[in-house]
Regions:
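N-terminal secretory signal peptides
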Residues: 1-15, 23-30
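Structural signature of eukaryotic scaffold interfaces centered on beta-propeller domains
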Residues: 61-75, 119-123, 127-163, 203-210, ...
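Short, conserved, GDST-rich strand-edge loop motifs in beta-rich repeat architectures
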Residues: 73-76, 165, 216-235, 274-293, ...
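Short loop/turn segments immediately following beta-strands, especially the blade-tip
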Residues: 98, 186, 299-315, 367-379, ...
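A short beta-strand motif characteristic of beta-propeller blades
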Residues: 103, 144-145, 189-193, 249-254, ...
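Beta-propeller blade signature
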Residues: 235-245, 291-303, 483-492
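Extracellular/periplasmic metallocenter environments
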Residues: 551, 613-655
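N-terminal edge beta-strand
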Residues: 555-581
Length: 655
């Protein structure tokens, strides 16, 4: 519908978007709007959803912040942002407040620029920790590796409740994997399969004393081996996984009820959490949204570790699995009832509270972490842990924090960001006549995740908030039917939120982690003394009597040929080599440049091969020489004035 037709029908673009979103939510029945209409607050939320003016409740002489997003030429950002790439399979690195994209880190995807998914080093990461069942599937399917991924929820490693600059972790919902990215080189060094679970979604690292565990939610219920039956969905379960963040091996799994959504960990190292929908064990949208309540599952880490030591588990596909189902009356879990289909799960930076975002309810449920000991001891009931449940608006999905006692929640249906005070919400829950909502700000459009600077640590600084919006509509020049997402930068340093900048992003960010630049110290070149990524190349070179840093040698072993060369602008150390048609060829290239930002590449024409070789790195690729003739190779990185001359030839002699 055009803007002109919208206006003729008495609808603004925002009204149209809000109505469309609310209509879409209607498939869940009347639950969402019904809950929204259960009070005056709900009436206001429903009004906002239909396009009414936003509510602004600034207190006294409240003023917006005055931060600037401008980062001039040659100036540096104050924060790194680790942005999920969603179905692109990659992780993205941005600077804040400029919102400039600094780097794309290929992880679960195949990448033409760097050769990720084609080089031997990347294939070792992609396939080095997969199950035998996956290995057989890839072989039978004629695949070197999975060609795609759906990367959600990047989060950094912790020591003592704050980022330690070592690793970033993220999940692959499409193919049930978890990755680790080394922050010194911004490359994935480990990717593991998660057996028994389906649809790895929520992912969070342990905060204290360190990471520790990385917790991964299996979203989709399936017939877990030894428990479920293929033809009876009522016997299907989800699986919660704890991964050792240092070894990237699975420590344990817990069998649970319902579809696990998002999760978080406490600040004390005692508990972890997962929101859960589909308590009905249904297989359709309508069926999975019929109950008035679902739950949050709380996991007692000490009890689980003791259960593992005591042997209270079953080994399922090589993994130790404990029974955390409600029907088992498990000592490892507690199920806290919350309104229908909770989504986001966020711990406040003071370590006191867990926020469970309602999605189909206009509420956020606030859990008091200090009450969990009594809950597991049987001294109180599950809902006694709830200390607030403010009604904020339609479609609350995720909550972030400023470290000053305020929370910021995305309202998907209302297309708004709502700022509210946690203490006031607790007072209101006790019956005090206080409104916790401080301000509502329009965002554009339909926000999902949000994140504040350092907001997931004890060092939350309350400077910036980023809203990851699922629709951009009219915010940018029309780029065709597929529109970019819209990431919006909001200044939260003052009393009022202030929208500062719109940033288009390619499909599709699902989360963001904002860390002070001072917390990280990436290298400027690769370290030859830390050859983890090219360890196999180093070992093979030693067997062949080759020193990689001085290599210019071709080694033949039957029909296997290994070509060792170096790259120094503007030449490869081997300008030409010959092989026979049908040979298995491995090319090793070592970039011996010692200065930063002098990356080389190796592209072999007509063979679908291109790879990146960073300063002081070694990269390799293996292929079969099936095409006879002359095939040029060249450096695809513009590294020198004689860049185009940096080339050579592979001559393939026909049979």
């Amino acid at each position: 519908m055009s803007d002109e037709k919208l206006e003729q029908n008495g609808l603004s673009r925002r009204s149209f978007l809000g109505t469309a979103a609310a209509s879409g939510a209607g498939i869940a029945g009347a639950g969402l709007l019904g809950l929204a209409g259960c009070s005056k607050d709900g009436e206001q939320a429903a009004a906002n959803a239909s396009g009414a003016a936003p509510v602004a409740k600034a207190q006294g002489e409240s003023k917006p912040g005055q931060l600037s997003s401008e980062v001039g030429p040659g100036e540096l950002d104050q924060y790194y942002g680790f942005l999920s790439g969603g179905q692109s399979g990659e992780m993205r690195l941005i600077g804040l407040p400029s919102m400039r994209e600094l780097m794309r880190i290929p992880v679960f995807n195949m990448d033409s620029a760097t050769g990720w998914g084609r080089t031997n080093e990347s294939l070792k990461v992609l396939n080095g920790n997969i199950t035998e069942e996956t290995r057989k599937f890839l072989k039978d399917s004629g695949l070197r590796c999975y060609p795609n991924g759906d990367l959600h929820h990047p989060h950094l490693s912790f020591t003592d409740q704050t980022y330690d600059g070592r690793y970033a972790y993220a999940n692959d919902k499409a193919n049930n994997r978890v990755c680790r990215v080394r922050l010194d080189v911004m490359k994935a060094d480990k990717i593991i399969d998660i057996p028994n679970a389906s649809g790895i979604h929520g992912l969070r690292p342990q905060r204290y004393p360190k990471t520790g565990y990385v917790f991964a939610n299996g979203e989709h219920i399936t017939p877990v081996s030894g428990v479920g039956k293929l033809d009876d969905a009522k016997t299907w379960n989800a699986v919660y996984t704890a991964i050792d963040g240092e070894t990237m091996e699975i420590a344990w799994q817990v069998l649970v009820d319902g579809n696990l959504d998002n999760g978080d960990a406490d600040y004390q190292g005692k508990y972890s959490f997962a929101t859960c929908y589909n308590s009905e064990r249904a297989l359709t949208v309508q069926g999975a949204s019929s109950n008035e309540q679902d739950w949050c599952v709380v996991f007692d880490l000490k009890a689980i570790e003791e259960g593992i030591k005591a042997g209270d588990f079953k080994e399922v596909n090589g993994v130790k699995m404990l029974d955390g189902r409600a029907e088992a009356k498990s000592k490892y879990t507690r199920y806290i009832p919350v309104p229908n289909s909770p989504h986001g799960c966020n711990a406040s930076p003071d370590g006191k509270y867990i926020m469970l975002n309602g999605k189909l309810s206009p509420t956020v449920t606030v859990l008091d972490v200090s009450k969990l000991d009594d809950l597991f001891a049987g001294k109180i009931k599950e809902r006694d842990v709830v200390v607030a449940e403010p009604q904020l608006g339609l479609g609350p999905l995720h909550t972030a924090f400023d470290g000053r006692g305020n929370a910021y929640t995305t309202l998907f249906i209302d297309s708004q960001m709502v700022k509210w005070n946690i203490d006031d919400a607790i007072k209101a829950y006790k019956g005090d006549k206080v409104d916790p909502i401080k301000q509502k700000l329009d965002v554009h459009y339909q926000p999902g995740h949000n994140h504040t600077t350092m907001g997931e640590t004890k060092e939350a600084d309350g400077q910036w908030l980023v809203s990851l919006n699922k629709f951009s509509k009219d915010r940018f020049l029309n780029a065709g039917p597929l529109k970019p997402e819209c990431d919006q930068l909001i200044d939260i340093s003052g009393d009022e939120m202030r929208l500062v900048h719109d940033n288009p992003t390619f499909a599709e960010p699902h989360d963001l982690c904002l860390v002070a630049a001072s917390k990280l110290n990436p290298g400027k070149t690769w370290d030859r003394k830390d050859p983890w990524f090219w360890q196999d190349a180093l070992e093979q070179a030693k067997k062949d009597g080759v020193e990689l840093e001085k290599a210019a040698k071709v080694v033949r072993e039957g029909n296997k040929v290994r070509v060792y060369m170096t790259a120094v602008a503007p030449a490869f150390s081997i300008p030409q080599f010959e092989v026979n048609q049908g040979d298995e060829v491995t090319v090793y290239v070592t970039n011996v440049e010692t200065i930063e930002d002098l990356t080389h590449g190796f592209t072999l024409e007509g063979y679908g091969i291109a790879m990146e070789i960073g300063p002081q790195a070694t990269s390799s690729v293996t292929f079969k020489a099936v095409r006879p003739g002359v095939h040029w190779y060249y450096c695809q990185w513009f590294c020198h004035a004689l860049h185009m001359e940096m080339s050579g030839q592979m001559i393939v002699k026909p049979k």
